[in-house]
Protein backbone atom coordinates (compact mmCIF):
# COMPACT_ATOMS: atom_id res chain seq x y z
CA UNK A 1 0.00 0.00 0.00
CA UNK A 2 1.35 3.43 -0.90
CA UNK A 3 1.08 6.46 1.38
CA UNK A 4 -1.53 8.22 -0.73
CA UNK A 5 -3.87 5.24 -0.45
CA UNK A 6 -3.17 5.00 3.29
CA UNK A 7 -3.94 8.69 3.78
CA UNK A 8 -7.21 8.25 1.93
CA UNK A 9 -8.13 5.31 4.15
CA UNK A 10 -7.36 6.92 7.48
CA UNK A 11 -9.08 10.20 6.58
CA UNK A 12 -12.17 8.05 6.02
CA UNK A 13 -11.66 6.69 9.55
CA UNK A 14 -10.66 3.23 8.34
CA UNK A 15 -8.01 1.18 10.12
CA UNK A 16 -5.00 -0.29 8.33
CA UNK A 17 -4.25 -4.01 8.39
CA UNK A 18 -0.93 -5.13 9.94
CA UNK A 19 0.55 -5.72 6.46
CA UNK A 20 -0.63 -2.32 5.22
CA UNK A 21 0.75 -0.54 8.29
CA UNK A 22 4.06 -2.37 7.94
CA UNK A 23 4.41 -1.26 4.32
CA UNK A 24 3.48 2.36 5.03
CA UNK A 25 5.70 2.67 8.10
CA UNK A 26 8.65 1.12 6.29
CA UNK A 27 8.18 3.66 3.49
CA UNK A 28 8.33 6.49 6.04
CA UNK A 29 11.34 5.06 7.88
CA UNK A 30 13.37 4.44 4.73
CA UNK A 31 12.97 7.91 3.24
CA UNK A 32 10.24 7.15 0.73
CA UNK A 33 7.75 9.75 1.98
CA UNK A 34 7.68 13.55 1.75
CA UNK A 35 7.48 15.68 4.91
CA UNK A 36 3.90 16.64 4.00
CA UNK A 37 2.92 12.98 3.64
CA UNK A 38 4.54 12.08 6.96
CA UNK A 39 2.83 14.96 8.78
CA UNK A 40 -0.52 14.15 7.22
CA UNK A 41 -0.18 10.48 8.09
CA UNK A 42 0.75 11.13 11.73
CA UNK A 43 -2.10 13.59 12.29
CA UNK A 44 -4.55 11.35 10.45
CA UNK A 45 -3.57 8.40 12.63
CA UNK A 46 -3.96 10.44 15.78
CA UNK A 47 -7.41 11.72 14.79
CA UNK A 48 -8.55 8.24 13.76
CA UNK A 49 -6.97 6.61 16.79
CA UNK A 50 -4.10 4.15 16.55
CA UNK A 51 -5.15 0.50 16.94
CA UNK A 52 -3.19 -2.21 18.77
CA UNK A 53 -2.49 -3.94 15.44
CA UNK A 54 -1.22 -0.72 13.85
CA UNK A 55 1.07 0.07 16.78
CA UNK A 56 2.44 -3.48 16.84
CA UNK A 57 3.20 -3.32 13.11
CA UNK A 58 4.93 0.07 13.46
CA UNK A 59 6.98 -1.12 16.44
CA UNK A 60 8.04 -4.22 14.51
CA UNK A 61 9.39 -2.02 11.71
CA UNK A 62 11.21 0.19 14.26
CA UNK A 63 12.78 -2.91 15.82
CA UNK A 64 13.76 -4.31 12.43
CA UNK A 65 15.54 -1.11 11.37
CA UNK A 66 17.19 -0.35 14.73
CA UNK A 67 20.93 -0.49 15.35
CA UNK A 68 20.90 -3.46 17.72
CA UNK A 69 22.70 -3.77 21.04
CA UNK A 70 23.66 -7.40 21.60
CA UNK A 71 24.21 -8.09 25.29
CA UNK A 72 24.27 -11.87 24.86
CA UNK A 73 22.09 -14.63 26.26
CA UNK A 74 23.02 -14.06 29.92
CA UNK A 75 20.77 -11.03 30.22
CA UNK A 76 17.31 -12.58 29.87
CA UNK A 77 16.10 -10.39 32.77
CA UNK A 78 17.05 -7.20 30.93
CA UNK A 79 14.69 -4.33 31.86
CA UNK A 80 13.86 -0.98 30.26
CA UNK A 81 12.20 1.89 32.16
CA UNK A 82 11.58 4.14 29.14
CA UNK A 83 8.11 5.73 28.92
CA UNK A 84 6.24 7.77 26.35
CA UNK A 85 6.80 11.13 28.04
CA UNK A 86 4.30 13.84 27.26
CA UNK A 87 2.55 14.08 30.62
CA UNK A 88 3.51 17.79 30.89
CA UNK A 89 3.78 17.58 34.69
CA UNK A 90 7.40 18.78 34.88
CA UNK A 91 8.62 16.22 37.40
CA UNK A 92 12.18 14.98 37.89
CA UNK A 93 13.64 12.26 35.62
CA UNK A 94 12.02 9.38 37.46
CA UNK A 95 12.56 6.63 34.90
CA UNK A 96 16.26 7.49 34.55
CA UNK A 97 16.86 7.54 38.30
CA UNK A 98 14.90 4.29 38.64
CA UNK A 99 17.20 2.65 36.09
CA UNK A 100 20.25 3.12 38.34
CA UNK A 101 18.45 1.89 41.45
CA UNK A 102 17.29 -1.18 39.52
CA UNK A 103 20.80 -1.88 38.21
CA UNK A 104 22.19 -1.52 41.74
CA UNK A 105 19.69 -4.18 42.79
CA UNK A 106 21.14 -6.74 40.40
CA UNK A 107 18.79 -6.35 37.45
CA UNK A 108 20.47 -5.44 34.13
CA UNK A 109 18.96 -2.33 32.55
CA UNK A 110 19.00 -1.14 28.93
CA UNK A 111 17.67 2.38 29.41
CA UNK A 112 16.26 3.63 26.13
CA UNK A 113 15.91 7.42 25.97
CA UNK A 114 16.39 10.76 24.28
CA UNK A 115 16.67 14.45 24.95
CA UNK A 116 13.63 16.27 26.28
CA UNK A 117 10.76 16.61 23.84
CA UNK A 118 7.88 17.58 26.10
CA UNK A 119 9.33 17.59 29.61
CA UNK A 120 11.77 19.95 31.29
CA UNK A 121 14.61 17.44 31.27
CA UNK A 122 15.08 14.29 29.20
CA UNK A 123 17.13 11.20 30.07
CA UNK A 124 19.97 12.29 27.80
CA UNK A 125 19.97 15.81 29.24
CA UNK A 126 20.28 14.44 32.77
CA UNK A 127 23.03 11.94 32.01
CA UNK A 128 25.09 14.53 30.15
CA UNK A 129 24.75 16.80 33.19
CA UNK A 130 26.20 13.94 35.25
CA UNK A 131 29.20 13.88 32.92
CA UNK A 132 28.34 10.70 31.02
CA UNK A 133 29.29 10.17 27.38
CA UNK A 134 26.22 9.17 25.39
CA UNK A 135 27.54 8.79 21.86
CA UNK A 136 28.83 5.23 22.16
CA UNK A 137 28.84 2.39 19.65
CA UNK A 138 26.38 -0.46 20.11
CA UNK A 139 29.28 -2.68 21.20
CA UNK A 140 30.33 -0.12 23.82
CA UNK A 141 26.78 0.14 25.19
CA UNK A 142 26.62 -3.65 25.49
CA UNK A 143 29.98 -3.65 27.28
CA UNK A 144 28.71 -0.94 29.64
CA UNK A 145 25.75 -3.14 30.57
CA UNK A 146 28.09 -6.09 31.18
CA UNK A 147 30.39 -4.03 33.42
CA UNK A 148 27.97 -1.81 35.33
CA UNK A 149 24.61 -3.56 34.84
CA UNK A 150 23.19 -0.50 33.06
CA UNK A 151 23.61 1.14 29.68
CA UNK A 152 21.98 4.09 27.94
CA UNK A 153 20.58 3.53 24.47
CA UNK A 154 20.50 7.02 22.99
CA UNK A 155 17.57 6.88 20.57
CA UNK A 156 19.03 8.97 17.69
CA UNK A 157 22.04 6.64 17.47
CA UNK A 158 20.02 3.43 17.45
CA UNK A 159 17.05 4.59 15.39
CA UNK A 160 18.81 6.49 12.61
CA UNK A 161 15.84 5.79 10.32
CA UNK A 162 13.88 8.20 12.52
CA UNK A 163 15.75 11.06 10.85
CA UNK A 164 13.19 11.02 8.04
CA UNK A 165 10.40 11.93 10.48
CA UNK A 166 12.25 14.35 12.76
CA UNK A 167 11.32 17.49 10.83
CA UNK A 168 7.57 16.79 10.55
CA UNK A 169 7.40 15.72 14.21
CA UNK A 170 9.04 18.92 15.42
CA UNK A 171 6.88 21.10 13.20
CA UNK A 172 3.68 19.35 14.30
CA UNK A 173 4.55 19.81 17.96
CA UNK A 174 1.91 17.35 19.16
CA UNK A 175 1.88 13.78 20.37
CA UNK A 176 2.05 11.29 17.49
CA UNK A 177 2.35 7.58 16.85
CA UNK A 178 6.12 7.83 17.38
CA UNK A 179 5.63 8.71 21.07
CA UNK A 180 3.85 5.39 21.49
CA UNK A 181 6.07 3.09 19.43
CA UNK A 182 9.44 4.51 20.55
CA UNK A 183 9.31 2.87 24.00
CA UNK A 184 8.15 -0.37 22.34
CA UNK A 185 11.35 -0.57 20.28
CA UNK A 186 14.22 -1.17 22.71
CA UNK A 187 17.36 -1.80 20.60
CA UNK A 188 18.68 -4.34 23.11
CA UNK A 189 15.47 -6.35 22.87
CA UNK A 190 14.48 -5.92 26.54
CA UNK A 191 11.42 -8.10 27.15
CA UNK A 192 10.71 -6.69 30.60
CA UNK A 193 9.57 -3.10 31.02
CA UNK A 194 8.13 -0.47 33.29
CA UNK A 195 6.42 1.78 30.75
CA UNK A 196 4.61 4.97 31.70
CA UNK A 197 2.10 6.33 29.19
CA UNK A 198 0.74 9.87 28.83
CA UNK A 199 -2.96 8.96 29.02
CA UNK A 200 -4.98 6.37 30.91
CA UNK A 201 -6.71 5.36 27.68
CA UNK A 202 -3.38 3.90 26.49
CA UNK A 203 -2.64 1.68 29.51
CA UNK A 204 -4.44 -1.43 28.24
CA UNK A 205 -3.71 -0.99 24.49
CA UNK A 206 0.05 -0.60 25.01
CA UNK A 207 0.07 -3.73 27.18
CA UNK A 208 -1.77 -5.53 24.36
CA UNK A 209 0.84 -4.36 21.84
CA UNK A 210 3.64 -5.78 24.01
CA UNK A 211 1.62 -8.97 24.44
CA UNK A 212 1.47 -9.28 20.63
CA UNK A 213 5.21 -8.58 20.39
CA UNK A 214 6.07 -11.35 22.87
CA UNK A 215 7.24 -9.44 25.96
CA UNK A 216 7.80 -11.41 29.18
CA UNK A 217 6.77 -9.16 32.08
CA UNK A 218 5.61 -5.57 31.72
CA UNK A 219 3.85 -2.93 33.80
CA UNK A 220 2.17 -0.18 31.77
CA UNK A 221 1.22 2.68 34.11
CA UNK A 222 -0.57 6.02 34.26
CA UNK A 223 -1.57 7.89 37.42
CA UNK A 224 -4.85 9.67 38.09
CA UNK A 225 -2.94 12.94 38.61
CA UNK A 226 -1.73 12.71 35.01
CA UNK A 227 1.76 11.42 35.79
CA UNK A 228 3.23 8.91 33.34
CA UNK A 229 4.83 7.09 36.29
CA UNK A 230 3.62 5.38 39.45
CA UNK A 231 2.60 8.39 41.53
CA UNK A 232 3.05 9.30 45.19
CA UNK A 233 0.20 11.82 44.96
CA UNK A 234 -2.66 9.76 43.50
CA UNK A 235 -3.77 6.23 42.59
CA UNK A 236 -2.06 4.67 39.57
CA UNK A 237 -3.72 2.51 36.95
CA UNK A 238 -1.63 -0.50 35.89
CA UNK A 239 -1.91 -3.11 33.16
CA UNK A 240 0.41 -6.00 34.02
CA UNK A 241 1.48 -8.41 31.28
CA UNK A 242 2.87 -11.63 32.67
CA UNK A 243 2.95 -15.16 31.28
CA UNK A 244 1.08 -13.95 28.22
CA UNK A 245 -1.88 -12.66 30.25
CA UNK A 246 -2.91 -9.08 31.07
CA UNK A 247 -4.35 -8.07 34.44
CA UNK A 248 -5.54 -4.52 35.18
CA UNK A 249 -5.64 -2.98 38.65
CA UNK A 250 -5.15 0.25 40.58
CA UNK A 251 -2.63 0.89 43.35
CA UNK A 252 -2.46 3.76 45.82
CA UNK A 253 0.70 5.14 47.44
CA UNK A 254 -0.48 3.55 50.69
CA UNK A 255 -0.77 0.13 49.02
CA UNK A 256 2.93 0.31 48.22
CA UNK A 257 4.01 1.62 51.62
CA UNK A 258 4.82 5.04 50.18
CA UNK A 259 4.58 8.38 51.93
CA UNK A 260 2.17 10.51 49.90
CA UNK A 261 3.31 13.95 48.80
CA UNK A 262 1.99 16.57 46.37
CA UNK A 263 3.61 16.67 42.95
CA UNK A 264 4.92 20.19 43.53
CA UNK A 265 7.53 18.59 45.82
CA UNK A 266 8.99 16.71 42.85
CA UNK A 267 8.50 19.39 40.18
CA UNK A 268 11.65 20.76 38.55
CA UNK A 269 12.60 23.84 36.58
CA UNK A 270 15.22 22.04 34.49
CA UNK A 271 17.99 19.46 34.37
CA UNK A 272 20.10 20.91 37.21
CA UNK A 273 17.09 20.86 39.50
CA UNK A 274 16.33 17.25 38.58
CA UNK A 275 19.91 16.13 39.17
CA UNK A 276 20.01 17.84 42.58
CA UNK A 277 16.83 16.03 43.67
CA UNK A 278 18.12 12.68 42.44
CA UNK A 279 21.49 13.13 44.17
CA UNK A 280 19.71 14.02 47.42
CA UNK A 281 17.53 10.90 47.16
CA UNK A 282 20.57 8.77 46.30
CA UNK A 283 22.35 10.11 49.39
CA UNK A 284 19.54 8.79 51.56
CA UNK A 285 17.47 11.92 52.18
CA UNK A 286 13.87 10.85 52.83
CA UNK A 287 12.40 13.47 50.55
CA UNK A 288 9.45 13.13 48.20
CA UNK A 289 11.86 12.46 45.33
CA UNK A 290 13.12 9.33 47.09
CA UNK A 291 9.56 8.04 47.44
CA UNK A 292 8.74 8.71 43.79
CA UNK A 293 11.94 7.02 42.61
CA UNK A 294 11.35 4.09 44.99
CA UNK A 295 7.83 3.61 43.63
CA UNK A 296 9.10 3.21 40.10
CA UNK A 297 12.39 1.47 40.77
CA UNK A 298 10.44 -0.96 42.95
CA UNK A 299 8.21 -1.74 39.99
CA UNK A 300 11.25 -2.29 37.76
CA UNK A 301 12.80 -4.61 40.36
CA UNK A 302 9.51 -6.50 40.40
CA UNK A 303 9.30 -6.98 36.62
CA UNK A 304 12.97 -7.95 36.63
CA UNK A 305 12.28 -10.72 39.12
CA UNK A 306 14.25 -9.24 42.02
CA UNK A 307 11.16 -8.58 44.18
CA UNK A 308 8.12 -10.85 44.69
CA UNK A 309 5.65 -7.96 44.60
CA UNK A 310 5.47 -4.19 44.19
CA UNK A 311 5.50 -3.32 47.88
CA UNK A 312 8.65 -5.32 48.55
CA UNK A 313 10.19 -3.86 45.42
CA UNK A 314 9.65 -0.39 46.89
CA UNK A 315 11.29 -1.44 50.17
CA UNK A 316 14.29 -2.82 48.30
CA UNK A 317 14.58 0.33 46.17
CA UNK A 318 14.72 2.49 49.31
CA UNK A 319 17.48 0.29 50.74
CA UNK A 320 19.51 0.67 47.55
CA UNK A 321 19.31 4.45 47.82
CA UNK A 322 20.00 4.77 51.55
CA UNK A 323 22.94 2.34 51.35
CA UNK A 324 24.62 4.39 48.63
CA UNK A 325 24.46 1.52 46.11
CA UNK A 326 22.40 3.52 43.60
CA UNK A 327 24.76 6.51 43.78
CA UNK A 328 27.76 4.21 43.32
CA UNK A 329 26.14 2.62 40.25
CA UNK A 330 25.55 6.05 38.71
CA UNK A 331 29.18 7.05 39.35
CA UNK A 332 30.48 3.81 37.83
CA UNK A 333 28.21 4.28 34.81
CA UNK A 334 29.54 7.79 34.15
CA UNK A 335 33.17 6.66 34.49
CA UNK A 336 32.61 3.61 32.28
CA UNK A 337 30.99 5.60 29.47
CA UNK A 338 33.97 7.96 29.44
CA UNK A 339 36.40 5.05 29.34
CA UNK A 340 34.51 3.26 26.55
CA UNK A 341 34.37 6.43 24.46
CA UNK A 342 38.17 6.62 24.23
Curated annotation (Swiss-Prot):
Binding positions for 5-phospho-alpha-D-ribose 1-diphosphate per the UniProt entry: 83, 86-87, 91, 93-96, 111-119, 123
Gene symbol of the encoding locus: trpD
Residue sites binding anthranilate 2 per the record: 169
Swiss-Prot/TrEMBL keywords: Amino-acid biosynthesis, Aromatic amino acid biosynthesis, Glycosyltransferase, Magnesium, Metal-binding, Transferase, Tryptophan biosynthesis
Described purpose of this protein according to its UniProt entry: Catalyzes the transfer of the phosphoribosyl group of 5-phosphorylribose-1-pyrophosphate (PRPP) to anthranilate to yield N-(5'-phosphoribosyl)-anthranilate (PRA).
Protein known as: Anthranilate phosphoribosyltransferase
GO cellular component: cytosol
Residue numbers binding Mg(2+) 2: 228-229
Amino acid sequence: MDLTAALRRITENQDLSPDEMTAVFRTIMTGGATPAQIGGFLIGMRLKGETVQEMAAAASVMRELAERVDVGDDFHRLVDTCGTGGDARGTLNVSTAAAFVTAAGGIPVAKHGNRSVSGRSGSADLLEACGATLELSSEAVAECIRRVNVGFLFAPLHHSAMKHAVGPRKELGVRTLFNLVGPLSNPAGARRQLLGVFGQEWVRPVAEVLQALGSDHVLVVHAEDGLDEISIAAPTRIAELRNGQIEEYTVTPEDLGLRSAPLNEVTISGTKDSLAMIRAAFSGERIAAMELIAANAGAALYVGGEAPDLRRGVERARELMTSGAAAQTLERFVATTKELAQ
